[in-house]
Amino acid sequence: MNPFRCDGPTLVNFSGGRTSGYMLRRILDAHDGTLPADTHIVFTNTGVERRETLEFIAECADQWGADIVWLQRDGKSPAGRRFHRVSYDTAARCGEPFAELITERKFLPNAVMRFCTQALKIETARDFMRSQGYEHWTSVLGLRRDESRRVSNVRARAHDEWDVSCPLHDAGVTAAHVAEFWRVQPFDLRLKSYEGNCTMCFQKGRAKRERIAREHPEFVAWWAEQEQRVGGRFCAHESGYAAMLEHVRRLPLLPMDLDPQGDDGCTGGFCTDRRRSRRPLWCMCKRRPGQPHALACVLARDEMQHVGTTEGV
């Protein structure tokens, strides 16, 4: 059986990334370009998606003739119907849905309580499917064979209203297959692999966020504003987004900033696991809690207390 065929009410979760775009193409091909009436391709906009992501989604729709439903959470609507439909032209671009959610909750999401993904994406898409009259459906996620641990995690979570399908995983698709597909397409997502769809997602590794802050300092303002108005931190072990921006402005680009390894942030509505940063056993610098190792080395070096290199950090 073709894992990309849709049987019965189906929600195709389109994150706006290359992997979910590849999955959408395979699903369309499995149905000769015309999806069943009860199959819905849904993109849920948080308001802090990258401009390039929104353009890519619109281009997928135009190039492939796909009917993509654009949704945003609407906290003012009754429970169970907290969404409204938007389009490329009307989708929020200044974080409005996310900021509204933070105002309601009165605290910030974090690595332990990632209610941003739950409320802005999962529950918004769920409410849409309910509004179509479905009591049960299949939720299709863009998780690959090389993301087997994530596949196991999402399949282990029981849901009364939907079953989870991961056709890319079942078909043996890996990141290499996705990259090869987009290499020969007439259009592509105009983002680097480390950037991700969400401007400054706190699930990204610190090095990735610092690199993005160097390249796009304007992205930091919204995140810093939320921390300031709520009086909290997205990352409890860090000093905050405003301090991070000041840090990257003061310090030169370090080798660790270019390390492609690390966290991938939140993709397709599911967040990756945090990884522990590695600290060389030979390093004797005195790192304060929450302080990046490379920064501690630089400060120690500047104070002539420590001589070394950040290679291998």
Name each region found by the language model.
Residues M1-V313:
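Nucleotide-activated chemistry modules centered on ATP-dependent adenylation/adenylyltransferase
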